[in-house]
Amino acid sequence: MAHDRRRILHFGVTAHPTAEWTAQQLREAFPWETAPRYLLRDRDRIFGADFVKQVKAMGIKQVLSAPRSPWQRAYIERLIGSIRRECLDHIIVFGESSLHRTLTSYFAYYHGWRTHLSLAKDAPHARRIQATAEGEVAEIREVGGLHHHYERRAA
């Protein structure tokens, strides 16, 4: 997650995350030398030797949070809670591919329409301001109808 606009840069789905899998996700998230300067992370076991080696090879400086201190990673903890409350608590997932499709749909909604107080009630991908002209207001369903946004159609 990029902290500046709360953008999700990359996500992966697996039933059994390992250090090797996590290192591969890092390579996929930042190809062609686009890696960030810092990586904030906790002390979970999935960040093992392979992951640490990959981080160093990419020139990223790791910033570890204190043990048992989720408040030090407030943005990502909030995102995980939002995914659970706003999406996964309402959907039955039938495997990894189903979860990947659901999260792809949710992140499209999250980036384009979900408001964030810290962004002055804007979305991570800034929305255009709609004119107040005459016209019908149309409901557009997101995440399979779980969420909605509204647009004014031209008269």
Segment roles from a protein language model:
Residues 1-155:
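Charged DNA-binding/catalytic regions of mobile-element recombinases
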